[in-house]
Amino acid sequence: MAEKVPPGLNRKTSRSTLSLPPEPVDIIRSKTCSRRVKINVGGLNHEVLWRTLDRLPRTRLGKLRDCNTHESLLEVCDDYNLNENEYFFDRHPGAFTSILNFYRTGKLHMMEEMCALSFGQELDYWGIDEIYLESCCQARYHQKKEQMNEELRREAETMREREGEEFDNTCCPEKRKKLWDLLEKPNSSVAAKILAIVSILFIVLSTIALSLNTLPELQEMDEFGQPNDNPQLAHVEAVCIAWFTMEYLLRFLSSPNKWKFFKGPLNVIDLLAILPYYVTIFLTESNKSVLQFQNVRRVVQIFRIMRILRILKLARHSTGLQSLGFTLRRSYNELGLLILFLAMGIMIFSSLVFFAEKDEDATKFTSIPASFWWATITMTTVGYGDIYPKTLLGKIVGGLCCIAGVLVIALPIPIIVNNFSEFYKEQKRQEKAIKRREALERAKRNGSIVSMNLKDAFARSMELIDVAVEKTGESANTKGSTDDNHLSPSRWKWARKALSETSSNKSYENKYQEVSQKDSHEQLNNTSSSSPQHLSAQKLEMLYNEITKTQPHSHPNPDGQEQAERPSTYEEEIEMEEVVCPQEQLAVAQTEGVVDMKSTSSIDSFTSCATDFTETERSPLPPPSASHLQMKFPPDLAGLEEHQRARAPPFLALIRQKGPTVREATPEYAPIDITVNLDAAGGPQGGPHGPLPTDCASESPKSSLKGSNPLKSRSLKVNFKDSRGGAPPTPPSTARPLPVTAADFPLTAPQLISTILLEETPSQGDRPLLGAEVHCQGPSKGLTPRFPKQKLFTFSARERRSFTEIDTGEDDDFLELQGTRRPDKQADSSPNCLTDKPSDGRDPLREEACVGSSSAQDTSHNCRQGIYHGVAEVKKDNSQEGCKMENHLFAPEIHSNPGDTGYCPTRETSM
């Protein structure tokens, strides 16, 4: 949605495969251009203010504003569209309505139709704690959640028991597992279901045969006159016992845990169902004599009665019977209480009825134990009528016994019934859960669906997660109030967030540090440790270079070399430190920000947006002040005005320099070293010394990316040295000043100055945005300044060097810097020299222009030299020794000579 498609690629192509991710400056610009943001949740669009989302900074939406890279955005949202300022979340749209209202009103409610666990998952996703639910929704939410958590806990225990059936430590584990599933899990396969049906049929057949053997018509008399089983029914019973025996042995052999198998209640029932048959056979066959048979006969009858326990084998295949057994086991407290009540009632009422009826003739209440039977059937409201009281007192006792029996039995019975109902539902739910889990596992093996682990999905919902995590590591460097990350609405910060807080470049920091790195990869890795919105321009350029190296389309540079072939240059980033200065301050005009970019594929435009030097314009702080920047240049070259009007595009520069040491300065005009690098896409041009080579002494590594870029850029970087001598102030400029503030420059000598000039290229006919109005004036001895007196901006006395790279799309030549010498009558003037020095195997033109002053008492203006000449003609006017051009960064009007009081015509210069 938010991609930039390179040339030659289809715009409909997927961003993740062929196109570059959006640049961080594009993301920053998209967020700062509007006070509102569009949030698309499951196809439902919402529009909300950024400051509303800032109320909960530690939530997912609160972190959205701080994500200024493609990777960090995709960690927070699922997709985004920078053109529409829209962010997409593939979540439940209904639940998000309640969550968004929490940002707006501070009240969190759960909708009636929402599932409790589903709403809890949404709260976890958006980073909001469930404890902030209002009281009207908390009871319903927590009740449903606890119920579901209990069911999930039971299911987890069941699954743990099933997962504990390990066959790895035994022989033939695969075959034994298949046999175990066939006998113990009827729903595992069709064969297991058939086997379970056959087992049920044998149980029913065995029960029917046992019942028919008791019929006299089907019995046979033995030699002792005792009835025996029918031979045909005996064969049927033998077959059934053989099946039960085989089934029991196979279960025992395939069981993963033999001792656990023996302790199982269903397995004990199976053993009791087959054991009496074998005991009976053993006793009858070992005692053939009449005397021995008579002694064993009663024992055999007991075991024959135990065969009726075969009917309990149906519990293996019936959930209801299993529930009944588990209910009796779980309700032993209630059953014990019921028996205790009955026993106490029987004892009391049997004693009362005995003393009431003992005087009657032919009474059946002969003793208290004989009265137990009457009390039992009376309290259970059965009343057989075989024994009853006859006296009035006995009848009253019988009535009280009936009432007490109803009350005693009615109290614990509902508890037992409720336990049975709950356990039965739980058994059915577990069966369905097991089926669902097995179906998911099969689907996972087939690759048709993603397996979901319910225990992991709802593990976090069982705990109260507080998202109020305090920031670490920021309190040491932050003055003022820390960021309130608590979710309580009473602690929200309702103050409007300043635009400077969201800018990509913080220009009002109190401390700066110097970073020096030689490897771009190392610098790129270091950027990941800091917040994306604090990336410097050089780091953003490194990031962009790393991205472009991976692309199949490389942009050739003017000398036909690829980006990868360029040698790595020593890069150093110098940042400044704020120093307190008692000097007076100069009001600096508001600067204008870069409001539009024609192309973001250029490195220069990329860094110009990233550094964002218009912080003073948007900041709520008062505008800082700066002293005058004083520059000394020789007189202007002829034809400067015509050339500048023909070459209107402004400059873009990215400065990398080392800080020089400081030495004592004399009250003289200080020399300035300027190295000019011109790299153009057009044909070569010649200067006064003939055509210049296109190779540059210190070529920027980003220049290879500009070969086919329509965006034209020029860059100038100048370091200055000053003189300690006094000089009158330069009047403040009414033109657009450089985006430099007093906070960016130290006002004492040993501090390093690094000025970055970033500007967008306008159309060919537009005037340069960076420039100053330059005037010529006569001698100004005794001149009274028109503006209030202010102190000069002082620089270190040592010579400072820098590069100036001017890239255009019209020419490919190097332009030449020339300076003129002051008349020899000026004793304190410095020579203007021109030298050529090779660097890195190439021969760039390095020019050193030195400027002098007429006298120590003369006005020391901030002069500026013509940087380059026109394309068609190059004029030199060495006779203009009495007039000097000023690099008027902050003043539009300059007097030509110290003694003049008039003004020369306005001349516009560009850096």
Curated annotation (Swiss-Prot):
Inhibited by quinine at micromolar levels. Modestly sensitive to millimolar levels of tetraethylammonium (TEA) and 4-aminopyridine (4-AP). Pfam families: BTB_2 (PF02214), Ion_trans (PF00520), Kv2channel (PF03521). Glycans are attached at N287. InterPro entries: BTB/POZ_dom, Ion_trans_dom, K_chnl_volt-dep_Kv, K_chnl_volt-dep_Kv2, K_chnl_volt-dep_Kv2.2, SKP1/BTB/POZ_sf, T1-type_BTB, VG_K_chnl. Residues 508-522, 837-849 have a biased composition (Basic and acidic residues). Phosphorylated. Phosphorylation at Ser-608 of the FFAT motif activates interaction with MOSPD2, VAPA and VAPB. SUPFAM superfamilies: POZ domain, Voltage-gated potassium channels. Residues 369-380, 381-388 dip into the membrane without crossing it. The transmembrane segment S4 functions as a voltage-sensor and is characterized by a series of positively charged amino acids at every third position. Channel opening and closing is effected by a conformation change that affects the position and orientation of the voltage-sensor paddle formed by S3 and S4 within the membrane. A transmembrane electric field that is positive inside would push the positively charged S4 segment outwards, thereby opening the pore, while a field that is negative inside would pull the S4 segment inwards and close the pore. This is Potassium voltage-gated channel subfamily B member 2.
